[in-house]
């Protein structure tokens, strides 16, 4: 099939699945992109393609700046904003010959786990075999649904605490969050600077590799992007360790964290996790239980740190510097104060305002010691736990002290339990996709719980991949309360299983993902 035919098929799917609301700004049927795809077809016939993405349609989450399409962040306050420049990742894709397939829907400013908090309406998951609509995950739900329904070849999302991996798990797609600093954030609208990572969604790991190779490079515009010298150090550390771990055996040591086996884990998800472990064991890999004691505090720390950074980042959207301005002030209003308050009050959604208030409180003089600083300490404990687990050591971190106590346990004992593994394999989400109706009844804290397995890797900046493990004959009968999502069929007959690797060992994560990708229940 020609590239133009493939592109037209994607556009036809955008029209067919328009009711799912995956796109805020879809690709227009007529436009200069057609000539670009024809040029790509010509290059392919001559065997001189720019890259594997040449002529392919790649969707962009609508919090990533594009010069030729609006960047709204799914917010009323930015519903008329168009960036004067492209984000670095968009430039990289266009240089590779990729065609921007449109801007995908999301939770406003990336704040949400179910893509329900959008000024342009919620994203809907595919529900052909379901009586009730189910969550597509968030905040990159639009990107995930677009990939799952063939509306594009691949899509970019952003992952702050699981916003690429959770939608991937809920839509039966592959979602990859690279190591923090590997992909440029320049041109990405900030939510939480120390956590935000551009991720990739695709239908297969080979697609993920194609996109990741294109966007994984140094960028002087982004101060958090790793420079060439640092990348060389990481590559050398991984290579040296790979030489060691391939001798005398080519098989891997795969860690299974005991802290992830929680009581609330859906029986269906637990069974999928167990079958994944057995599958890897049958391939000859060694399965080892490991301990990550700080994991139980990770979610609470995340929901202090991320809103704190957001309260600062979103202060610029005031109707003066950025954003839609509300000028309908009463005669007796104080001009400056009313403009700020009214523009933000009307322009920002309820979930965004909730997190801004939470973040502002945690940074206040009365709360910073008890909340923000404690959350930072927990983040370092989470990072230290991962560092003890992996056989490869992160050359950018100081040696981990094993003498102090964590939760009353001796760290030497913990280090002894964690003999050194190459990768961790855990569920992406504790339950199957919840129904939309159950989410409307759930409390805010209950909706935050879906991030419990994705947040730890984000706090540590580690690479993580969600793979849909196909589970034939995996029944959800008896899973429990359907209001929690446990009574829903797994999207596309799959359950999301997550591989987490050491910082910089992104290739290992993708390698293990390929092992799981070929698995059938």
UniProtKB/Swiss-Prot annotation:
Catalytic residues, chain numbering: 61, 139, 163
Bilayer-crossing residues are none
Top-rank taxon: Eukaryota
Q: What class of enzyme is it?
A: ligase
Q: Which GO terms describe its biological process?
A: glutaminyl-tRNAGln biosynthesis via transamidation; mitochondrial translation
Tell me which GO cellular component terms the UniProt record holds. Answer: glutamyl-tRNA(Gln) amidotransferase complex; mitochondrion
Report the EC number(s), separated by commas if there are several: 6.3.5.7
Keywords associated with the record: ATP-binding, Ligase, Mitochondrion, Nucleotide-binding, Protein biosynthesis
Q: According to its UniProt record, where is this protein located?
A: Mitochondrion
| GO MF | ATP binding; glutaminyl-tRNA synthase (glutamine-hydrolyzing) activity
Disulfide bond positions: none
Has UniProt tagged this entry with the keyword Mitochondrion? yes
Q: Does the keyword Protein biosynthesis apply?
A: yes
Q: Which reaction does it catalyse?
A: L-glutamyl-tRNA(Gln) + L-glutamine + ATP + H2O = L-glutaminyl-tRNA(Gln) + L-glutamate + ADP + phosphate + H(+)
For this chain, the family text in UniProt reads: Belongs to the amidase family. GatA subfamily.
Spell out the HAMAP family in the cross-references: GatA (MF_00120)
What's the subunit arrangement here?
Subunit of the heterotrimeric GatCAB amidotransferase (AdT) complex, composed of A, B and C subunits.
Instruction: Briefly state the protein's biological role.
Output: Allows the formation of correctly charged Gln-tRNA(Gln) through the transamidation of misacylated Glu-tRNA(Gln) in the mitochondria. The reaction takes place in the presence of glutamine and ATP through an activated gamma-phospho-Glu-tRNA(Gln).
Q: What is this protein called?
A: Glutamyl-tRNA(Gln) amidotransferase subunit A, mitochondrial
Instruction: Please name the source species.
Output: Ajellomyces capsulatus (strain G186AR / H82 / ATCC MYA-2454 / RMSCC 2432) (Darling's disease fungus)
């Amino acid at each position: 099939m020609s590239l133009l035919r493939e592109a037209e098929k994607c556009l036809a799917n955008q029209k067919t699945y328009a009711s799912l609301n995956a796109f805020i700004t879809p690709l227009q049927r007529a436009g200069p992109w057609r000539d670009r795809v024809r040029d790509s077809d010509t290059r392919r016939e001559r065997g001189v393609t720019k890259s594997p993405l040449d002529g392919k349609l790649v969707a962009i989450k609508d919090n990533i700046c594009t010069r030729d399409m609006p960047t709204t962040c799914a917010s009323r306050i930015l519903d008329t904003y168009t960036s004067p420049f492209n984000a670095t990742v968009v430039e990289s894709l266009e240089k590779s010959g990729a065609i921007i397939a449109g801007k995908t829907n999301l939770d406003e400013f990336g704040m949400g786990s179910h893509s329900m908090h959008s000024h342009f309406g919620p994203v809907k998951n595919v529900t052909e075999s379901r009586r009730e609509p189910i969550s597509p995950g968030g905040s990159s739900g639009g990107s995930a649904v677009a990939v799952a329904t063939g509306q594009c070849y691949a899509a970019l999302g952003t992952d702050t605490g699981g916003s690429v991996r959770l939608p991937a798990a809920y839509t039966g797609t592959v979602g990859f969050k690279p190591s923090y600093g590997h992909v440029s954030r320049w041109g990405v609208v900030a939510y939480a600077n120390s956590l935000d990572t551009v991720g990739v969604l695709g239908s297969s790991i080979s697609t993920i590799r194609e996109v990741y190779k294109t966007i994984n490079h140094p960028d002087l515009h982004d101060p958090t992007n790793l420079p060439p010298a640092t990348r060389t150090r990481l590559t050398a550390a991984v290579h040296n360790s790979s030489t060691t771990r391939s001798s005398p055996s080519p098989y891997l040591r795969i860690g299974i964290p005991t802290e992830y086996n929680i009581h609330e884990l859906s029986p269906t998800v637990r069974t999928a996790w167990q079958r994944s472990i057995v599958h890897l064991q049958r391939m000859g890999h060694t399965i080892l239980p490991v301990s990550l004691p700080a994991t139980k505090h990770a979610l609470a720390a995340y929901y202090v740190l991320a809103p704190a950074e957001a309260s600062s980042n979103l202060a610029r959207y005031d109707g003066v510097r950025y954003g839609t301005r509300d000028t309908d002030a009463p005669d007796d209003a104080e001009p400056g104060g009313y403009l700020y308050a009214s523009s933000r009050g009307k322009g920002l959604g309820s979930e965004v305002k909730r997190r801004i208030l939470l973040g502002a409180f945690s940074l206040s003089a009365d709360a910073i010691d008890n909340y923000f600083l404690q959350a930072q300490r927990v983040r370092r404990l989470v990072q230290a736990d991962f560092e003890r687990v992996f056989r490869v050591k992160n050359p950018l971190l100081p040696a981990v002290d094993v003498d102090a106590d964590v939760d009353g346990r001796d760290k030497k004992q913990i280090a002894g339990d964690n003999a050194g593994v190459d990768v961790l394999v855990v569920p992406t989400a504790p339950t199957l996709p919840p129904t939309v109706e159950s989410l409307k009844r759930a409390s805010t804290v209950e909706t935050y719980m879906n991030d419990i397995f994705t947040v730890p890797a984000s706090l540590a900046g580690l690479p993580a991949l969600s793979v849909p493990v196909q589970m034939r004959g995996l029944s959800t009968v008896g899973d429990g309360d359907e209001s929690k999502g446990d009574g829903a069929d797994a999207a596309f007959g799959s359950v999301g299983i997550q591989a987490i690797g050491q910082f910089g060992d992104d290739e290992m994560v993708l390698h293990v993902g390929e092992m799981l990708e070929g698995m059938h229940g």
